[in-house]
């Protein structure tokens, strides 16, 4: 492929990408846009690393009851560093999650488990690849 053809193809792909919406399939099969997210950084107190990991594992069950939480990840970044990443169709879904059971449980246990308060950052989803 010549450079000119490559650049034309790249421009077409960029146009399609920017015109497309990101969709996730919900349990009912109806698509939902994923537009906003949260990134929550967590630093475990010394000796509480496995308790934080277990909290995140158990948190998944609580999130299952939140229809507007399209994706939710509890991740370990290092020996004592963890994070939660989740995405929502809109700010109402994000606010519902922040008022939900996982957030309440995290705040209730933060003093015991975390070296510092959770760092909660709101984000806009620019692009993603989701199953479905």
Predicted regions and their residues:
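An amphipathic, aromatic/His-enriched active-site/gating alpha helix that lines ligand/cofactor pockets
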Residues: 2-14, 31, 58-71, 87-122
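Hydrophobic h-region of N-terminal signal peptides that target proteins for export
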Residues: 14-20
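A short beta-turn/loop motif at secondary-structure boundaries
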Residues: 75-79
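C-terminal segment of N-terminal export signals and the immediately downstream linker at the start
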Residues: 20-39
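Short, low-order "capping/linker" segments at domain edges
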Residues: 128-132
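Short hydrophobic/aromatic beta-strand micro-patches
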Residues: 41-43, 85-87
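Short, surface-exposed ligand-recognition loops at beta-strand->loop->(often short) alpha-helix junctions
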Residues: 43-53
């Amino acid at each position: 492929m010549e450079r000119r053809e490559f650049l034309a193809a790249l421009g077409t792909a960029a146009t399609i990408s920017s015109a497309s919406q990101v969709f996730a399939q919900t349990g009912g099969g109806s698509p939902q846009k994923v537009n906003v997210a949260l990134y929550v950084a967590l630093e475990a107190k010394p000796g509480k690393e496995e308790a934080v990991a277990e909290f995140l594992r158990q948190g998944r069950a609580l999130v299952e009851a939140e229809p507007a939480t399209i994706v939710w990840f509890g991740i370990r970044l290092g020996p004592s560093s963890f994070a939660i990443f989740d995405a929502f169709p809109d700010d109402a879904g994000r606010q519902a999650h922040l008022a939900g059971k996982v957030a309440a449980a995290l705040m209730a246990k933060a003093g015991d488990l975390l070296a510092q308060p959770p760092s909660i950052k709101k984000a806009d989803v620019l692009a993603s690849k989701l199953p479905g």
